[in-house]
Amino acid sequence: MTQQAANALPPVARTYQVRTYGCQMNVHDSERLAGLLEDAGYRRAADGADADVVVFNTCAVRENADNKLYGNLSHLAPRKRSEPQMQIAVGGCLAQKDRDAVLRRAPWVDVVFGTHNIGSLPTLLERARHNRAAQVEIAEALQEFPSTLPAARESAYAGWVSISVGCNNTCTFCIVPSLRGKEVDRRPGDVLAEIQTLVDQGVLEVTLLGQNVNAYGVSFAADERLREDPRMWQSAPHRNRGAFAELLRACGRIDGLERVRFTSPHPAEFTDDVIEAMAETPNVCPALHMPLQSGSDRILRAMRRSYRAEKYLGIIDRVRAAIPDAAITTDLIVGFPGETEEDFQATLDVVAASRFSSAFTFQYSKRPGTPAADMPGQLPKAVVSERYQRLIELQERISLEENQAQVGRTLELLVATGEGRKDAATARLSGRARDGRLVHFAPGAAADEPLARRAFDQVRPGDVVTTTVTGAAPHHLIADGALLTHRRTRAGDAHAAGLRPRTGVGLGIPGVGAPAPAPVTTGCAL
């Protein structure tokens, strides 16, 4: 081929890969990063292939997050030396925290961006290629609400929907508020419009996201009055305390939306109107994830958690009275500074009384910049590890007993992908019950399906089935009998066709077009 003919060929789009660490907020942010890159002309790298651009979306909650990031960056260093045209970007909470330190520890990184300016990523990548220099851009405040950005959703059947970003709490162990900023809430109409967009594309389930979802309404309650007359600030309400319950009820009026979940509420602000909305809104799932952190009132006070064990247990009692089949899960921290054996026993007592279906349990991790990092009474690792094992053993026993109580029940499952590591070996598929429990099930033909359709009606991720639980383990259920029903869905059609929902409008986000392929040279490429 002549050089002139080669130059006439369209440029090949560069490929990208996003690696995500941390919470659901980061998972959803990674969908936005993917959407931004695809809108800019990049395409997702095939599984197992080396991407031209590797983006790390990081977490800063625990020390091992630091170790994981810098370990993975070190693994990419040899490739960067041999392929200088490839690019590495680091974003998220750890980038917001470490800033220029990322380049000091990993000088082969091309772009560092923070939690407030993820929309800048395509421009920063292009600028780094053009200028042959690393770009560090950390904004101190939110530049645009992330949900206005384009998002390439991972799932055809379930979607994350942010209702707020940031947090107004001051938990002494948590670094998130300093990295994500004060709480900013989306307008209910914007939230509901995004949900409707997802449902219109076949999505059956949404999870409402916020650092403290039941504080929803804190940042927009005063706005309407202030628009009319800024002098009314003193008399304007600073909070619509019923806003989150109202939002749940509004979700119940969206046709085609079958499941609504939310994470995470704060016990200090959990009100009965939310319990009533959960119980009275059919598509709100009977599931509640509510962080406890500690069962000791003394430790809760030191954590600045603004509730005590009695209040927490009272919420659980009221939830179970209104929603008897609710599955309740939690977060727990072991080894907070100053924790005594008596404090730890109080945590065991609350866990035993709460009967959580599962718990995310962590050993306390000292995070520089948090008040807890400078507290006296930092515990030896051996003490923390021993207590952690005792807590795990208790919760594993409770989880198994709670799951064993499900044996014989008929459950509706939303068929999922990537949930069962042994599905290929066991010939099972996996799905989530309405209460969030993971169920591995035999995908045989449903009893209600005509024989002529059974070969056609293969069960697909995004479809809905009902089945009977036949076995239990601490972290999952087994259903090895024949399916009772199988409903094909638009979400299943979309998954089978490889289609992913798209949301966001990209307001104010510059498009950079498909980047031209970089020539293979020494040094950084244009």
Curated annotation (Swiss-Prot):
Disulfide cross-links: none
Domain TRAM: 404-483
Cellular component per GO, a single term: cytosol
CDD domains associated with the record: Radical_SAM (cd01335)
Subcellular location: Cytoplasm
Record InterPro entries: Elp3/MiaA/NifB-like_rSAM (IPR006638), Methylthiotransferase (IPR005839), Methylthiotransferase_CS (IPR020612), Methylthiotransferase_N (IPR013848), Methylthiotransferase_N_sf (IPR038135), MiaB_methiolase (IPR006463), rSAM (IPR007197), rSAM_horseshoe (IPR023404)
Catalytic activities: N(6)-dimethylallyladenosine(37) in tRNA + (sulfur carrier)-SH + AH2 + 2 S-adenosyl-L-methionine = 2-methylsulfanyl-N(6)-dimethylallyladenosine(37) in tRNA + (sulfur carrier)-H + 5'-deoxyadenosine + L-methionine + A + S-adenosyl-L-homocysteine + 2 H(+)
Subunit structure: Monomer.
Protein name: tRNA-2-methylthio-N(6)-dimethylallyladenosine synthase
Organism this protein belongs to: Mycobacterium sp. (strain JLS)
